[in-house]
């Protein structure tokens, strides 16, 4: 009886020290090597501030994004748009151009690389998964909704070709 109690207590202690995958999401967040210089296929706008951001989808994959914000903001929170390109494309191409152009028109935007693509994480590389890419959009909207400069009631998405 005493031995059973000790074994049960040891098991419970061990079990309580482990974490579920959901609890461990941010500890296992991939460290991405993000390019800081302008590396787009289009010219940089002088009307927009640009920065790199990352966020994690529900599969624990870290996504890389370019954030574009208008330099001139007329008070209040901004409407926001998440943009991603055709399957296999990266944010330095058309989705970045769309995002920058929309930021020039007053939106806060992010252009992101889907899972397994570009600067985003995930294995195997260079594959497209419509189910996971849909989750990537959901994670992008969730990320935008947490920003203090975004109106969470006015967030949209644009999927270019293939979406």
Provide a role label for each language-model segment.
Residues 20-22:
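Boundary at the C-terminal end of the N-terminal hydrophobic targeting segment
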Residues 28-76:
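N-terminal cap/lid segment of alpha/beta-hydrolase-fold proteins
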Residues 76-86:
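Short beta-strand element of the alpha/beta-hydrolase
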Residues 88-100, 114:
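The serine-hydrolase catalytic nucleophile loop
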Residues 93, 116-128:
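Glycine-rich "HGGG/HGxG" loop immediately N-terminal to the catalytic nucleophile
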Residues 101-121:
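Conserved alpha/beta-hydrolase
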Residues 127-148:
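Alpha/beta-hydrolase active-site loop
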Residues 149-161:
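Alpha/beta-hydrolase fold nucleophile elbow
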């Amino acid at each position: 009886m005493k031995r059973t109690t000790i074994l049960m207590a040891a098991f419970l202690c061990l079990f309580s020290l482990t974490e579920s995958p959901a609890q461990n999401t941010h500890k296992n967040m991939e460290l991405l090597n993000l390019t800081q210089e302008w590396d787009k296929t289009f010219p940089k706008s002088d009307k927009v501030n640009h920065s790199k951001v990352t966020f994690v989808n529900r599969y624990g994959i870290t996504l890389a994004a370019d954030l574009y914000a208008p330099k001139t903001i007329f008070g209040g929170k901004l409407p926001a748009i998440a943009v991603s390109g055709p399957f296999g494309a990266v944010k330095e191409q058309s989705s970045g151009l769309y995002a920058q152009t929309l930021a020039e028109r007053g939106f806060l935007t992010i252009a992101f690389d889907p899972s397994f693509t570009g600067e985003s994480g995930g294995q195997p590389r260079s594959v497209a998964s419509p189910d996971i890419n849909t989750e990537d959009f959901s994670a992008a909207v969730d990320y935008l909704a947490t920003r203090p400069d975004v109106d969470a009631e006015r967030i949209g998405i644009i999927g270019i070709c293939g979406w």
